[in-house]
C-alpha cells in the first residue's frame, strides 16, 4: 500500500480519516490522498487521538513523541505530522 504524504520542515505530513468505535483497530487503506484508519477507542476525551498516535507509532516504527495531530483533533479528518521521517 502506497501511503500519500507530503514533506514538511521536520518530517512528513499525512491526511488521515479515522473511524472511532470500530470493532477492530488498524490501517484500512487509502482513499484518494487520505489514509483510512479504524480505531476501537471512542472519540471521547482524546482517547481516539491517543490510539491513533499509538497505532501510527507501531506501524511506522517511530516514537509516539514524534507524532503530532496538527489539525482536526476534534474531527474524523485529521492532519498528522511525523517528525524525523523523510519517506514512507
Where are the language model's segments positioned?
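Flexible glycine-/small-residue-rich
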Residues: 18-20, 39, 82-84
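N-terminal first-folded block
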Residues: 1-34
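C-terminal structural segments of small proteins and small subunits
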Residues: 58-88
Amino acid at each position: 500500500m502506497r501511503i500519500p504524504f507530503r514533506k514538511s520542515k521536520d518530517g512528513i505530513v499525512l491526511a488521515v480519516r479515522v473511524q472511532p468505535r470500530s470493532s477492530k483497530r488498524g490501517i484500512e487503506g487509502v482513499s484518494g490522498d487520505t489514509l483510512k484508519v479504524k480505531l476501537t477507542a471512542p472519540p471521547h476525551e482524546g482517547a481516539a487521538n491517543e490510539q491513533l498516535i499509538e497505532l501510527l507509532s507501531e506501524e511506522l516504527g517511530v516514537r509516539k513523541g514524534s507524532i503530532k495531530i496538527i489539525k482536526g483533533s476534534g474531527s474524523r479528518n485529521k492532519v498528522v505530522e511525523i517528525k524525523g521521517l523523510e519517506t514512507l
